[in-house]
């Protein structure tokens, strides 16, 4: 194998436009004709044929000219692989397989739609099934077989796992998996007969020759530390396997790192090995001392394109059928062709068939008119016309975007329902048709000039303030009732370089009622949680159970039942309600509730988990999921009450029914009682509505149907069925009557109507009533709109969850859920973190086609007031259980290996209002941040990383002998995947949070959270550094009067730079802290000492001068501690 070298090099995929240039992704020599196939990253296929030329070339002997060029993939998917066929060439891309003849005409295209196989995507490789050229085996996430003679269906093999490479032998398929494993698969028995584990990282290439398989790949590089990312290194060996004996043979060493390996097609003992850096080696596998080594020139011959290390690589190594040529590509769109010297052959195979040439039509003969400077253009005639030409417009006429008038978009739902026979056109929804609509130019549209989004807090100056006239985000009514006002829109949280803390939530809420953030998982539940929060009866009942203790810590609950937080839906709901009581208009998070919900097995089975902000749900699916969640919430809270405290929601939301079954034909007469927590509102049939209306009533009376008619029909049912016991001897009917016998203080009504049913209630102007009365007679409950006595119970509308449809109901990701809630005789709109007052007339106006009530809630009018915990009386509450502050409660019980670094509180040290405590928390990252990088290098934060509490330390802060002694030092148990332990910042090492190996004081999240919640309600003063971010990640709202944050004390707003705890300790305390990994006990104690120093400087009147000196010293030291 002497004398090999480069004989040709062409820029195969280069283009005159830099934008259109694309990389070579696949190469293949044709086995029928003298062609070399080349595929690029944009799905284009080219073929080249060798030709003799007299033009001087930089590489002698052979010139490649392009024979054909055509598109072979859908969109811009790259061509991954070629496969030769007698009648053409098969090309594989991400989601399709194309079969073209050699001129480029498409013969067959296989994709998920043509095969009716939704799993036919994410394809990676293909080959023929053993020795046939008609059965095509395609691999990716699954393994398929397609008959090219009958390409209308697929056959799936019994194989699981991602396949990245595939080849065939006489009897088997050789499957290369992405983890470095090679499987020998028998397509006849449909099973794997042997597996080889040659590489513990990735697989880069395999080749099959007879009964031998060769492979090369990567291995995992040992990590230098636990926090570093996994990396791979190229294996310096080529593995060889013998399929006759099903064992591996001695590997072939290749010190440069083997990236590609090919058997010589004519010399089975010769193997060609190549590295990505361009080193090629011909080696005899039976005599490995017989080696020929070459180095490819991967530099670019085009001087205009600089050569960089990112472009100098070798890829896509292939060998011709006669073994006389090899080809590969580099990073400059160059195709390299090699052969041995003195090779006069120009054929890639020994006996190539005739290469069909393109047909040329003779040129069309016509008399051309020569137009030059001498011949005027006006000599060429034009057709007769009367009107002015388009080019004849005034010189002062300009076309600008602001003056443009664009037509309205056609609603897709109109096109979908164009053949509907029931409601062919909804005038209420779309307005009158065939009208000349008035279009307003953009520059006259006032709404485009108004402000919808706030500035970041860091961008504001002292002159920025709220201005209702400059913002229309609170606009709830438009002149065009078919458009959705801004206050109902899907709100998006914007992130600056300072994260979510820089977003101005106060821009959207100027009330004392708190909104909920919507950038978390399962944020669709916000509107329903806000509705239940402002029901005094429901809220008071839920939060009073927080006084009691339920802290499961057994490993069965934590691991087997999938509840690592040791919490429940009931507890987390109570914490949310209490947090919203304390926040007084500040935004709140539902992260802990969402995590417990996501790990709830019942919620998973009912498909209530949503992690994409409902982007894949249409209007019907959103209505269904929020209705299911309403039932799930009440039933789960009821079960939690039974399991935890031996009580239930029966006194709050339980609706009682009597079901009577009787017959006149036999002696069946049964009466049963049942109950449910919610009501599924049913629309009466048309004939029932006509009975309710009465045929003799006037037109005005017919429009007075309301929700009470629907409630009465839904709760009082009557039907007849055949008696199964007596059907043969004496046929007769059974009468089944359901009657309402009890209504609770809170009535939760699910309104999951169809589109036609919603259209019907929009015709009733007073369908949603603000109040109604119930009467009890003969142990039955009936509804009345008005009352004339004191024997009835009065119910008032608390509010309802409303779906906002933007565009067609079939569109996904365009719709929103809001809630209208009546609080202290005033109505408010809650749209996640937007809260605003709204007129009562707007609440009861259901005539908008985009506005649909989904969950309606009524409550007794004589309900109690809202209850909340007060610091002065919290410790004296009779049901309070605060024993967790004075004892250990480890997850899985107390273990001997646990190392304690704290001293528990005693009853003599019981905290009370004003008790000073120092706190610091450490976190781990469960998910990395999501970034959007633009072509110009601009990075936008789409979603911040998800931090989870890992350690919490609380120290005694009052003056005394135990000042600075910790009494809480909890490590939070984690059973889920942790993306980054943030060891340099948190001090948490891998294994510290694992219940099977940790030596730390592991507790559940709810155990530690309850300790902080008790300290908060007891009135303790929290001292720390950067507490705003800590409390946000913990999901705990602490009022400002209970926070002493040293990051805020030692801060000059005009300089807009906050000082680190490490730097402040060095300047003020003359101590170096955080010299290694962070320790939360050390950080909390340092913050406590800084606070004491602040009090000392303030008392002697030197704080201001000291603060300015700190900043001056910081500028000289660049705010860094020397030698740190």
From Swiss-Prot:
What are the residue boundaries of the Exonuclease domain, all occurrences included? 917-1091
Question: Which UniProt key words apply to this protein?
Answer: Cytoplasm, Exonuclease, Hydrolase, Metal-binding, mRNA processing, Nuclease, Repeat, WD repeat
Q: How is its activity regulated?
A: Positively regulated by the regulatory subunit PAN3.
Q: Where is this region: Linker?
A: 351-484
Q: Which cofactor does it need?
A: a divalent metal cation
User: Which E.C. number(s) belong to this protein?
Assistant: 3.1.13.4
What does the record say about how the cofactor binds? Binds 2 metal cations per subunit in the catalytic exonuclease domain.
Q: Give the USP domain ranges.
A: 484-861
Q: Where does a divalent metal cation bind?
A: 920, 922, 1030, 1083
Q: Which InterPro entries match?
A: Exonuclease_RNaseT/DNA_pol3, PAN2, PAN2-PAN3_catalytic_subunit, PAN2_N, PAN2_UCH_dom, Papain-like_cys_pep_sf, RNaseH-like_sf, RNaseH_sf
Q: Where in the cell is it found?
A: Cytoplasm
Residues making up the signal peptide according to the UniProt record: none
Query: Where, in residue numbers, are the WD repeats?
Result: 19-58, 118-157, 158-195, 309-348
Quaternary structure per UniProt? Forms a heterotrimer with an asymmetric homodimer of the regulatory subunit PAN3 to form the poly(A)-nuclease (PAN) deadenylation complex.
The domain-related comment in the record is:
Contains a pseudo-UCH domain. This ubiquitin C-terminal hydrolase (UCH)-like or ubiquitin specific protease (USP)-like domain is predicted to be catalytically inactive because it lacks the active site catalytic triad characteristic of thiol proteases, with residues at the equivalent structural positions that are incompatible with catalysis, and it cannot bind ubiquitin. It functions as a structural scaffold for intra- and intermolecular interactions in the complex. The linker, or PAN3 interaction domain (PID), between the WD40 repeats and the pseudo-UCH domain mediates interaction with PAN3.
Q: What HAMAP family does the record point to?
A: PAN2
Per the entry, what this protein does is:
Catalytic subunit of the poly(A)-nuclease (PAN) deadenylation complex, one of two cytoplasmic mRNA deadenylases involved in mRNA turnover. PAN specifically shortens poly(A) tails of RNA and the activity is stimulated by poly(A)-binding protein PAB1. PAN deadenylation is followed by rapid degradation of the shortened mRNA tails by the CCR4-NOT complex. Deadenylated mRNAs are then degraded by two alternative mechanisms, namely exosome-mediated 3'-5' exonucleolytic degradation, or deadenylation-dependent mRNA decaping and subsequent 5'-3' exonucleolytic degradation by XRN1.
Q: What is this protein called?
A: PAN2-PAN3 deadenylation complex catalytic subunit PAN2
The lineage, from the top, is: Eukaryota, Fungi, Dikarya, Ascomycota, Saccharomycotina
* Name of the gene encoding the protein in the UniProt record: PAN2
